[in-house]
Amino acid sequence: MVTSGDSNRVRTHHVVEDTRTPKWLRSCGPRCVGGRIPLLLWCGLAGAIGIGGSVGDVGAQDTTRARPLQAVRVTVTRESARSVLDLPFGASRVSIDSARTGIRRASLTEMLFNVPGLEVSNRYNPTQDPRLAVRGFGSRSAFGIRGVRVMRDGVPLTQADGQTAVDFVDLEGVGSAEVMRGAAGALYGNASGGVLELKSDPFPSRGFEPTVRYVANADATRLSASSAGSSGAFGWRGTATHNFGDGPRDYSEFRSTAFTGDASWRGSAGTLRAQLTRYDSPTAQNPGAVTAAELRTVPTVADSQNVLRRAGKEVGQTLLSLTGDRTWDAGSASATVFTGWRDLYNPLAFAIIGLDRRTLGVSTRVEQRGMMRNHLWRLSAGADVQSQRDDRRNFANCAGQATLPSLPNCPTVNQRGTESIHQLEKVASAGLFARGEVNRSVVTVTGTLRGDQTAFSVRDYRALYAVGGAVESRTMSAVTPMLGISLRARPTLAVYANIASSFETPTTTELANRPDGSAGLNRDLKPQRGRTLEAGVKGIVARRVFVDLAIFSIATRDELIPFEIPNSGGRRYFRNAGKTQREGGELSVSTTVGPMDLGGALTRLSYTYEDYRVGTTVLDGKKVPGVAPLSSSLFATARRSPGFFTVEMQQGARTAADDANVNYAPGWVLWNARVGVTRWAESGVQPVVGVDNIFDRHYAANIVTNATRGRFFEPGAGRRVYVSVRVGRVSAR
């Protein structure tokens, strides 16, 4: 989607040769969506595109919401900012508070709405991060984010083992997000699905900018205060946010506080930037998943075992980073040093997990550009080194045991019973990459090569003096190439293709959760590897109409699959599937028609096992669970000074919940709406009133694949009315 969060109006002129409505949109039929209501809306959008393509010069329009395509630039390629048309893979940039004015900045689900190929599931569970999946990668995540590399302002949030926790990230200061869709191994290493980079709001060019935001509904309240300013070469921003409430379900109370500090100094040769994030969550209850019957009738109910065992989470996390950038006439270089720590106390139904984590990392890159025989060339290279040190202790969860006979693991009435695991887990990852690009006229050829090595080691303190030693180690490595080509069919339209590879290791948690319950590393679990073929087209196909279309085929070997063991209390274990095959396509369309912004995204996937056996059961040909075969979204925003009105639709198809394809989550369609004032006179007050899930549908917001006790579904929230008020002054940027 081509949008801009800039507050100043900009007049633009798109160079477009063909103003006719695309034939494939005019002939929109049932196959293009697969549902009557979304079908009508998608065809309505196609009709609006036809209108948008026939209206006069775009330069005569208010383009605060749509910038020229050449100006839509991303840095997710690990280079200086590039036009999306130069990239031989799917990439999206979302500017916050642009076409979708009035969002609350409360969750990634809301922020990344309408990005094709990207599924963000809000679990409505305060102990769980949203599930973020790109082209199905990441859908297996039991907690946190897997399979997708996540960064903020170039600082990795993903740990050395590939796991990402984003509960500590305050989105109040985020101004935009960039998504790289597809195999990211050649650029970032341990990531199968792609990359998400969050970009902070720019500092004011001068002056002082204080802001306060209040957001509330019946079960949650969010208070945020921020202040930003600049003086000469120095810029700064500080944001503090407090969240609290009872949650949309039984036993889902939460309370958290986050602080983010950001300071930058710009000199004649480059910049120096320091960032600090601190997060504390002393209360977060875990309501767990529900059965199909509960999803239909009482989706707000909590798992009785979670309530009995007082399942929840207490966490504190700090991240500190320092980044230096330097530029010269034909190149640039940057280096980032970061460190962090995370303290976790996590009672679950099957155990109590205590974790003390320390992390350290360095990322560097250098880029050089030049001309040779009328060819523009660009070379870049870099290195990433990360370390992760986890002191893990597991205890029996004895909550609810007071009225029962004493057990060996629960000799007292305290919640924390005897210790079952005490081990030191270390992960060290190192990667080197090089990227080359040659451009002549309308053709750009890109090649990338990366080598990675990830070393895991575990020291079992409980077996320190055991025969055979107490230290286990494993090392996983990969070389991941990528080759792509991009062709400018018109100045504002590009066709591209690529072949790429990916590599994804198990996390320390996935390796440590051994089905036999013993300490150490699961030596049977292998890294997941894949190869992607992709082709697509992106750009302006008619005046004001931006289209991003991609088709892809992904062959994966040793895919990591989660499962549960009966009577294990919901603990997640992992195994490898022999081979899986992913085929799919994704489409996004956005346009502006008079005072209205319109947009839609559609993702169609077919993911199957090709070689997968569990015991004597052959699962070849079965659908990979947890991945919706069809999902779509639409939005429309109407503006009339000083206000706006937005309506949104989201759709998810019926989705398998287990490897055998016996249990399914039903399909669903949700509607949201909001109305607000963009700026009330000179006071800077921006009130918004909205309704989520207008028709109060019962649906599965997330699927717990291969769960036991029939608890496959984490329900979404019912109808919720909310109020948001932002008071602030906007300075020049």
Give residue spans per PLM region.
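N-terminal periplasmic "start-of-domain" segments of outer-membrane beta-barrel proteins
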Residues: 71-103, 109, 129-133, 148
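Short acidic/polar hinge/loop motifs at secondary-structure boundaries
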Residues: 148, 155-181
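Short strand-turn segments of transmembrane beta-barrel domains in outer membranes
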Residues: 176, 183-185, 194-229, 240, ...
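Transmembrane beta-barrel wall of Gram-negative outer-membrane proteins
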Residues: 215-244, 249-286, 311-328, 360, ...
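Conserved C-terminal beta-signal and adjacent last beta-strands/turns
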Residues: 226-228, 379, 497, 601, ...
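Membrane-embedded beta-barrel scaffold of Gram-negative outer-membrane proteins
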Residues: 229, 323-327, 332-345, 488, ...
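Surface-exposed extracellular loop regions of Gram-negative outer-membrane beta-barrel proteins
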Residues: 284, 289-295, 387-410, 455-464, ...
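Gram-negative outer-membrane beta-barrel transporters
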Residues: 366-368, 373-374, 439, 445, ...
